[in-house]
Amino acid sequence: MTTRIERPLSPHLQAYRVTLTMAMSIIHRITGVALYFGTLLLAWWLIAAASGPGAYANVQAFTSSFIGRLIVFGYTWALLHHLLSGVRHFVWDLGYGFKPGEREALTWGALIGGISLTILLWIAAYAIGGGR
C-alpha cells in the first residue's frame, strides 16, 4: 500500500492581486495570437493584390467597411503593442527594469505607447490619403 505524502499546494490564482504587469503579460500573449490571425488577413490582401483587380477590389471592399477598418485598426494596435511589450521583455532579459517603479514605468510605457503610436499611424495614413 502506498503512503500518501502531504505536500504543500500551489496558491490558486485567486490568491494573487492582479497587477498591471500581470495583465500586460496576458495581453502580450493575446496580441501574439491576434497577430497570427491578422497575418492571415494580410496574406489574403497580398494574394488578392497579386491575383488581379477583381480580387483586390473584394478585399478593399471588406477592409474599407466599418468592421474591416475596426479589424485593421485592432491589428495595428496589436502589432505595435506586441512590439513595445517585446522591447519591455528584452529590457528585462538584459537584467534591467525589475524594481517596482521601473517595472510599472515600462508597463505603462508599452501600454500608452502602443495606443499612441496606433493613433498617430492612423492619423498619418489618413493624412496622406490612405483612408479614402
Predicted feature locations:
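Membrane-embedded alpha-helical bundles that constitute the cytochrome b-like, heme-associated redox core
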Residues: M1-R132
